[in-house]
Amino acid sequence: MHVMIDLETMGTRPNAPIIALGAAMFDGNSVLETFYTNIDLESAVDDGHAVVDPKTVLWWMEQGGEARSALRENKKKVVTALYEFRDWLKPVDPEGVWGNGASFDNIILSETYRRLNLTPPWEFWKDRCYRTMKGMYPQIKTDRSGVHHNALGDAVSQANHLIKIWREGMGR
């Protein structure tokens, strides 16, 4: 079992505030289960000791209304979101925890746990990089669906693309 994580953030560094967390649990055939939560920006900054990047805020202002409006619904305190994600992930003990970039999703999420004196719910050696895989197999295109820059939609699309890479590129 593997998990693909996607974050929407207000920065690009390890101390970026997370404003949405999406995840897709998958095997070599399909996405089996999903997780999604929005996080209150004020809580992410105040409670999570995160730092907003003004350039990222300006970037978000240029994104589609559908992606931005989804972030305003059902926001939770950062610590609540982290506990809920831990409770969703921990029973599975995934083989790999994937993010779109070796220095983005997994690092930001792990660092958020640590800043709140919590242990990330996976071991660091399970970190995997989806961006590396898609770079190794550029001929295998993704069948993108859903709203771009929606953490759940992106996690599901990335997981499905990785499954396609495993099948077509690696013969798994």
Please report, for each region that a protein language model flagged, where it lies by residue.
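Non-transmembrane alpha-helical segments in soluble domains
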Residues: 68-69, 86, 110, 159, ...
